[in-house]
Amino acid sequence: MKTKLRVLMYCALTYCTAAAAAPMQAREAAPPANPQIDMRGYLAVANEAAAHRNTHRLSEADFLRLSNDPGTVVLDARSKEKYDLLHVRGAVNLSFSDITVARLAQLLPNKDTRILIYCNNNFRNNELAFPTKMATASLNLSTYIALYTYGYRNVYELAPLLDAGTTKLELVASTRR
């Protein structure tokens, strides 16, 4: 009986030691760093952008009024496919995956330009053109943070959830499909 107990204790101790060492080995085998991906920097900018965003959210009426001002750009960062189905009249499409220094410099050379953004989660009752994302994955959030990261501070976001069929914002399909 004593021998069985010793063997059992030895096995348990060996298992516990191996389990405790596993996280250390995993840390040592971490993938190499990528200088083009900076999670800490992203989170810092995201927090700063979130504070900025608090005072840059617009009602439907204010969005409509400002969208008619000369020099204001309404930016739709959804896919071209969704943009072509339905978008705010006058909006310019720059898919989120295409937001780069070069494309922004081409489309918005002046970082002081007023930019109005909206996304899928601003419209309901048209899932084909505006498929709903999880609230924490809303394209407005990613777009706002990206523009802020690239130095654009005159960015305003459409705040409310609107019915695509009754909104005062004119929604149109692209004619160049």
Predicted segments — roles?
Residues 62, 78, 142:
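Short Gly/charged-rich anion-binding patches and loops
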Residues 2-6, 10, 19-54, 84-88, ...:
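Rhodanese-like catalytic fold shared by cysteine-dependent sulfurtransferases
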